[in-house]
């Protein structure tokens, strides 16, 4: 198994410096990860830094709270793609889901899907804040809205990916969508366990350590 191609090599910290982003890009080139995941302000820089490789540029929309309007999320998506993004990780409107406003949750996702054109859209459900039933419902809504992936977590809330959540999400969406586990893999064994549970991507800042068989510091 080429585990490197499961990994979105991630740096989303608000205080990330250019030299840290450059290090992320260098590691991505060396290890051939699926993508780098960076904040929108770094997308153009990342695209240039990955020219000549097959590493994709992933960015985040409505991040990390998901509480911006659908129009803002759509604008963020379009601008990110103009700047070179290949993949969009968007955060759902968690408050709307919790309030039972499922129509808003679905239309919010659909707004990003439509703005993305042919680019990949991953829907962050922030599983740590949801009941199992809410996880099932929002995965179904993401599927209905035409998204490509469901993703467990932002890494900025109360918890990251769990095996139980990845298993439930995979059971819900079947084989039609990708499932991304984010914020829970700190070792090769962790990453492998998520893949075996049904994850097709792993979002982590510890990609290099994982591939080296080391235990990473940090929680994303």
From Swiss-Prot:
Q: Which InterPro entries match?
A: Aldolase_TIM, DeoC, DeoC/FbaB/LacD_aldolase, DeoC_typeI
Record GO biological process? 2-deoxyribose 1-phosphate catabolic process; carbohydrate catabolic process; deoxyribonucleotide catabolic process
Could you tell me the EC number(s) of this protein? Answer: 4.1.2.4
Q: Record's Gene3D superfamilies?
A: Aldolase class I
**Where does the record place the catalytic residues?**
89, 151, 180
Instruction: List the GO terms this entry assigns under cellular component, sorted alphabetically.
Output: cytoplasm
Keyword annotations for this protein? Answer: Cytoplasm, Lyase, Schiff base
Which reactions is this enzyme annotated as catalysing?
A: 2-deoxy-D-ribose 5-phosphate = D-glyceraldehyde 3-phosphate + acetaldehyde
Where is the protein found, in the record's own terms? Cytoplasm
Q: Which Pfam families match?
A: DeoC (PF01791)
Report the enzyme's class at the first EC level. lyase
Which HAMAP family would you find in this protein's record? DeoC_type1
| Protein family according to the UniProt entry | Belongs to the DeoC/FbaB aldolase family. DeoC type 1 subfamily.
Instruction: Provide the protein name.
Output: Deoxyribose-phosphate aldolase
């Amino acid at each position: 198994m080429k585990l490197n191609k499961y990994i979105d090599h991630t740096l989303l910290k608000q205080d990330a410096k250019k030299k840290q982003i450059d290090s992320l890009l260098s590691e991505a080139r060396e290890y051939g990860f699926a993508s780098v995941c960076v904040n929108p302000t770094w997308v153009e820089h990342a695209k240039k830094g990955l020219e000549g490789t097959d590493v994709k540029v992933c960015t985040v929309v409505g991040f990390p709270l998901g509480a911006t309007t659908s129009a803002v999320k759509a604008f963020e998506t379009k601008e990110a793609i103009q700047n070179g993004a290949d993949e969009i990780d968007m955060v759902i409107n968690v408050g709307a889901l919790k309030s039972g406003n499922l129509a808003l949750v679905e239309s919010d996702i659909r707004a990003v899907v439509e703005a993305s054109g042919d680019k990949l859209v991953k829907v962050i459900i922030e599983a740590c804040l949801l009941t199992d039933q809410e996880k099932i419902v929002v995965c179904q809504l993401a599927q209905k809205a035409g998204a490509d992936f469901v993703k467990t977590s932002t890494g900025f809330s109360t918890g990251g990916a769990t095996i139980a959540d990845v298993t439930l999400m995979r059971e819900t969406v079947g084989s039609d969508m990708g499932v991304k586990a984010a914020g829970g893999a700190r070792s090769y064994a962790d990453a492998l366990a998520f893949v075996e549970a049904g994850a097709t991507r792993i979002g982590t800042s510890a990609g290099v350590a994982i591939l080296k068989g080391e235990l990473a510091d940090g929680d994303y």
